[in-house]
Amino acid sequence: MFQLRNFEAIKIGLASPEKIREWSRGEVKKPETINYRTLKPERDGLFCERIFGPTKDWECHCGKYKRVRYKGVVCDRCGVEVTRSKVRRERMGHIELAAPVAHIWYVKGIPSRMGLLLDMSPRALEKVLYFVSYVVIDPGDTPLTKKQLLSEKEYRDYLDKYGNRFRAGMGAEAIKELLQEIDLEKLSKELRAEIRESTGQKRVRAIRRLEVVQAFIDSGNRPEWMILDVIPVIPPDLRPMVQLDGGRFATSDLNDLYRRVINRNNRLKKLLDLGAPDIIVRNEKRMLQEAVDALIDNGRRGRPVTGPGNRPLKSLSDMLKGKQGRFRQNLLGKRVDYSGRSVIVVGPELKVYQCGLPKEMALELFKPFVMKKLVDEGLAQHIKSAKRMVEKVKPEVWDVLEEVIKEHPVLLNRAPTLHRLGIQAFEPVLVEGRAIKLHPLVCTAYNADFDGDQMAVHVPLSMEAQAEARFLMLAANNILKPQDGKPVMTPTQDMVLGCYYLTADEEGVPGEGKYFSSPEEAIMAYQLGYIHIHAKIKVKMTKEIDGVKKSKIIETTVGKIIFNEAIPQDLGYVDRTNPETAFDLEINDLVDKSKLGKILDRVYRLHGPTKTAETLDKIKELGFRYSTKAAITVSVSDMVIPKEKEKLLKEADEMVSKIESQFRRGLISEEERYESVIRTWNMTTEKVTEALMASLDKFNPIFMMAHSGARGSKNQIRQLAGMRGLMADPSGRIIELPIRSNFREGLNVLEFFISTHGARKGLADTALRTADSGYLTRRLVDVSQDVIVREDDCGADEGIYVEEIREGNEIIEKLADRIIGRVAAEDVIDNEGNIIVRRNELINEEEAEKIEKAGITKVRIRSLLTCKSRHGVCRMCYGRDLATGELVNIGEAVGIIAAQAIGEPGTQLTMRTFHTGGVAGADITQGLPRVEELFEARKPKGLAVISEISGVVRINESKKRREVIVTDEENNISKTYLIPYGSRLKVHDGQVIQAGDELTEGSVNPHDLLKIKGIFAVQTYLLQEVQKVYRLQGVEINDKHIEVIIRQMMRKVKVEDPGDTSMLPGELIDMFKFEDENKKAIEKGLRPATGRRALLGITKAALATDSFLSAASFQETTRVLTDAAIKGKVDPLLGLKENVIIGKLIPAGTGLSRYRNISVVKKVNDQQERQDKEKEETEVKASN
């Protein structure tokens, strides 16, 4: 029995004709499919039952044997074996070709493998294969050379001249003979010698040929197997033929393609039997070659074969390729049973870990469980009657359903699933109606809203799946974002507004200054309407301190008392050891969205997920209740237009006319005029906004919404009641006429027209961005999917130094943010010599704060960039798992998490290329395209000139050009750099610079940086540049996620000189493999290879992975498979995708072998007793 768990690796290779015949159950001789009268398959045809198995379970073709009892009998009349019809999905047939045919993948691929082996150009090869020219196979004693091409006329002339003294042929037969004659070992030696001696183009060609030759030697494939004598026919159920309603048939394109091959093959056989003239036979052979080409890869050569309506037919290659191909459509993602989908509605009454499931959906999803329970409880006699009960929906079914779904979590998923929080587990609660109820706090993680979104429900069936859902995926356990470790379940919108209103205070409201003997009394007074919720009151607080009751009067409001009931009172906001502050409320000031986030972060750190979930639910209750009680609403009169607006606009007009007159007098240029006008209007807009914000009352509903972080922003208020300001035209250039009106006054026609540009651009941008961001995520996942935490400590001594990231004077990322949750690579010592953190210890928040306070500017931490693990990474180099706050567990799929962390916020990044206020010079790419440019390691737009040597700068400006000369006095070398027109210099005369420093503004080409400054510099540069793009958009991503990707981009070494190893010059090889090969060589006393680390873009890195399954399912499927087959590649199944494709458990999380092979011990005590007993027995024996 073939068991999925039983194999470790999967190998691909070329199939020999013998192998194909071995797979086959019989030869397909006729092009017929099924008989039009009986609708039964024709014998020896493409659907023949004798070859492929019966169409009906346990029934032969002629009907002599029916029923299971004849299992395995081969019918003596029709020759069909009696078995399950399922075998028609796995049994193959074959076609014996009358003439050999070349496999198009190896002829037309780039580079053409067959051409390289034979040292023929692809064009020459094509001429021979498609019967245009003859090729000399054996020149004999004639002046011809082997593999020389001869035209029809030349061939006839030579034939007349030399007769049978030479041999030439055409078509695949000739090529097959040439391939059979190749002596691979001898050719390999010759090519290695040629590589050592030659240079230039000749050497490159020799290296490429050697690569193919070496592949054939290593894999044990024979070159002549690239020519097909036999063609395999895939099982009929994989190319089905189905009857439509109208009595017509729909068939897979493959059947058409196979039929053409069989027809042409049969015709060729007949012609050969008849001894037809050579030219006719040749034409038929060419047509057969073309038919087989179309079957294998239609459209690769010449015009594709089309079906009805000029649609190209889908060949075998198309079955694998692309989003609809076998890999991505059926192997990586399948449709699953026990699932449903429906619209979502809000469920504010739910707990964080619950969701509302519609009754009828739940009944359908849990049907088998309900049926079993009905039988167990004696409500039904057997499963069949139980099924009938469920289908008729008898009343007792509902009670059973209630019991069944208790403690049985379900998974909810919303598409698009951009990160792992897009699928979470909940405990179902049955609800009436047909909509799924969703807890409002998980909306942020799902990016869901209730305007018609739909969600899918999945039921985990096995006990393991249920346990996993409950412990790892339950919404209450996923409170922190894996991106940055901040809480993802922060209250939003109404809840924030309610808490803000609750904790506000107001002057001169009823009940101000009153005293109360206890918080309860104050709350009662509020409920009876004696005091206002915002009134400042004095309350006596009583607490037990060291067993003694003490009390103190504090000033607060009823709202704050109510709010604090929901918050644990030991978060450290108040110093409880100080008698002065010991009685204060934990939160005694105004609470907005960011404050709520910080409170929850503390609750999580101090009390863990369960308490946090409780607190969240309490805050949710309060928020909703008090935003309703506050009755905050928006009306036109809330948009107060500031009185100063007129005056400010007048001043601006005067400024602009001054600028215009200066321009007319020729004092300033057009550029300067434009810039000054823009600057003036921007300043005016700012001033109007400031005046507006100052004039708004602090209880103005619009102000409250924006200020609390519930909805809207300062920017939007400005447009409602201030002025809309400057707009951009379609090209992105700012129009110098601002929109003076706001939405309350209304815009005039021209203003409205100007503002349509921005709106339209915004929509187009969003659509493009979503697609680009999705594709970027897919590439990131593919490059990093096999990065899994595989060991505790890789033992790396080195780490990297980190310091804060700055852009000019602005700090983009603080040092503390970069080191929290990382492991120190060396002791961190302050100025007094005290050790703050020891080597190999995790740095937490308090320690990071201490380090910053001690004035330490750079810290050496363990990093993924220096991790020594061969496959995946180790726990110490990764540090804290951001979603739990603990050191990462072995088996965590950190690669995928990294890809999701970088890809998910991708949609928020802007697309636009900023035009620097009309300054001539290169546009700096920003946003998503910049991230892509960095990860693909492309030569950036707006390239900066960088210095290749360290030294002193001298700037030489003449009328025609600007030069920067860098001189290194010590080594006596100098380099001159020509500065392109319009670039801004970053250096000044006499400045001392280091190699790799930028001379002009712009982006650095990472490949140049790698050459000049080395690996560490380029890794740091990529990390910091990616961080800059995200931070400027206000998105926080932890460094370690970006490090995972950069690590994958730099895994390969490019071999420069192979020495005496088996590597090839220019080959890309994994750095660990490179070290191994060299170790082996040195041990044998041979010359080791030299090479340099290569920087690959993510697409290239994903295709260069060891796993051909992963690469083939990513992009360029045919190229990857062609290459893998020739090399006889073995896929070690280390990554996630490969294992999903072949249907094994993924080697991450609970799928790791160390977690799978566990024996459960019933009771610790029993085991302990047994061990003690054994110990005693051995002691007794020893004493005897």
UniProtKB/Swiss-Prot annotation:
Key word Secreted present: no
InterPro entries in alphabetical order: DNA-dir_RpoC_beta_prime, DNA-dir_RpoC_beta_prime_bact, RNA_pol_asu, RNA_pol_N, RNA_pol_Rpb1_1, RNA_pol_Rpb1_3, RNA_pol_Rpb1_3_sf, RNA_pol_Rpb1_4
Residue sites binding Mg(2+) per the record: 449, 451, 453
Residue numbers binding Zn(2+) 1: 60, 62, 75, 78
Cofactor binding: number and manner: Binds 1 Mg(2+) ion per subunit. Binds 2 Zn(2+) ions per subunit.
Catalytic reaction equation(s): RNA(n) + a ribonucleoside 5'-triphosphate = RNA(n+1) + diphosphate
SMART domains, alphabetized: RPOLA_N
UniProt-annotated stretches for the region Disordered: 1165-1184
GO MF term list: DNA binding; DNA-directed RNA polymerase activity; magnesium ion binding; zinc ion binding
Annotated protein name in UniProt: DNA-directed RNA polymerase subunit beta'
Species of origin: Thermoanaerobacter pseudethanolicus (strain ATCC 33223 / 39E)
High-level lineage: Bacteria, Bacillati, Bacillota, Clostridia, Thermoanaerobacterales
Recorded name of the encoding gene: rpoC
